[in-house]
């Protein structure tokens, strides 16, 4: 049986696994490893510790579809809309720039529901808290080691983690990647930011006319979302679910600070924008070290083949 490993349980990894299952008709074993404790990657949805049905998107807030990708990826959008995974964004987002021909969507069940859908379609065996440390070439197969020291062999490995993490891998991969590819990977850069989710008591109201707002005059906060209102999932069972995204400069400056200190700073700034908020019943602070790509690998749009036989691919 042909064995495939996909590293990374975000959108790229889950969709890649689903497409492999669809396109490969031969017997196929699909494994998906992620070093995190949950799936989603930059499409993470957090649950309230008091009520798991109360959720907040800490990563991507909505999906923007340009006319180009509406045509190129039409089947994907139609499929997700047909299954109720995506819905048109109808709630007001103050300060959002809407370009001609663009469409915006939200995931009513949380943005991680997109990843869950594709993982289910893929039939992949998912392993969390499994961090790849080495990739070696053994008898024309990839021997992949994780941080506990255990190894498994695969016929094909697809890496979907951030480029700096690939450059940190040990083993034969160090010498198998060409110097040109290494330079391309090293040139990839990312923005960094924090997200703070605040879960409030059921029955509490945040009386503002918007579901989300871009902030332009605060050194700390760039975006605020009343997440349940944005996704049209407000209910008497859950209180408001407030999500705050910081500015990139704030994220870079405080990247190595403790989450407790960062959360306190964000909360102080939030009070200046939405004064009088009661204490939340729970919070979740999330560091996005690799938030968005600001500089992609030159001449390798979308993917890079690191080794041909057997295949080792970076997407």
From Swiss-Prot:
Endpoints of the signal sequence: 1-17
UniProt organism field: Rattus norvegicus
Annotated GO CC locations: extracellular region; extracellular space
Catalysed conversion reaction: 1,2-dihydro-beta-NAD + O2 + H(+) = H2O2 + NAD(+); 1,2-dihydro-beta-NADP + O2 + H(+) = H2O2 + NADP(+); 1,6-dihydro-beta-NADP + O2 + H(+) = H2O2 + NADP(+); 1,6-dihydro-beta-NAD + O2 + H(+) = H2O2 + NAD(+)
Molecular function terms from GO: epinephrine binding; monoamine oxidase activity; NADH binding; oxidoreductase activity; oxidoreductase activity, acting on NAD(P)H
Protein name, as recorded: Renalase
Keyword rRNA-binding attached: no
Subcellular location: Secreted
């Amino acid at each position: 049986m042909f064995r495939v490993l996909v590293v990374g349980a975000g959108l790229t990894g889950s969709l890649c696994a689903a497409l492999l299952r669809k396109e490969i008709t031969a017997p196929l074993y699909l494994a998906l490893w992620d070093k995190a404790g949950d799936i989603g990657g930059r499409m993470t949805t957090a649950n309230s510790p008091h009520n798991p049905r109360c959720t907040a998107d800490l990563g991507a807030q909505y999906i923007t579809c340009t006319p180009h990708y509406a045509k190129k990826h039409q089947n994907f959008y139609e499929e997700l809309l047909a299954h109720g995974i995506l819905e048109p964004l109808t709630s007001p987002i103050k300060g959002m720039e809407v370009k001609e021909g663009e469409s915006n969507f939200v995931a009513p069940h949380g943005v991680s529901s997109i990843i869950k859908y594709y993982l289910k379609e893929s039939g992949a065996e998912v392993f969390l808290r499994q961090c790849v440390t080495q990739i070696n070439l053994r008898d024309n197969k990839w021997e992949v080691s994780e941080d506990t020291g255990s190894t498994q062999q695969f016929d094909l490995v697809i890496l979907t983690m951030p480029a700096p993490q690939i450059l940190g891998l040990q083993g034969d991969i160090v010498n198998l990647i060409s110097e040109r590819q290494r330079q391309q990977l090293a040139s990839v850069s990312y923005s960094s930011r924090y997200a703070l989710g605040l879960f409030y008591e059921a029955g509490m109201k945040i009386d503002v006319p918007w579901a989300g707002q871009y902030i332009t005059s605060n050194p700390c906060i760039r975006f605020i979302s009343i997440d349940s209102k944005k996704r049209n999932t407000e209910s008497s069972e859950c209180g408001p679910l407030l999500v705050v995204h910081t500015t990139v400069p704030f994220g870079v400056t405080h990247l190595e600070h403790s989450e407790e200190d960062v959360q306190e700073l964000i909360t102080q700034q939030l009070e200046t924008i939405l004064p009088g908020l009661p204490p939340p019943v729970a919070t979740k602070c999330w560091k996005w070290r690799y938030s968005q790509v600001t500089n992609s690998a030159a001449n390798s749009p979308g993917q890079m083949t690191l080794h041909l036989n057997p295949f080792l691919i970076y997407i």
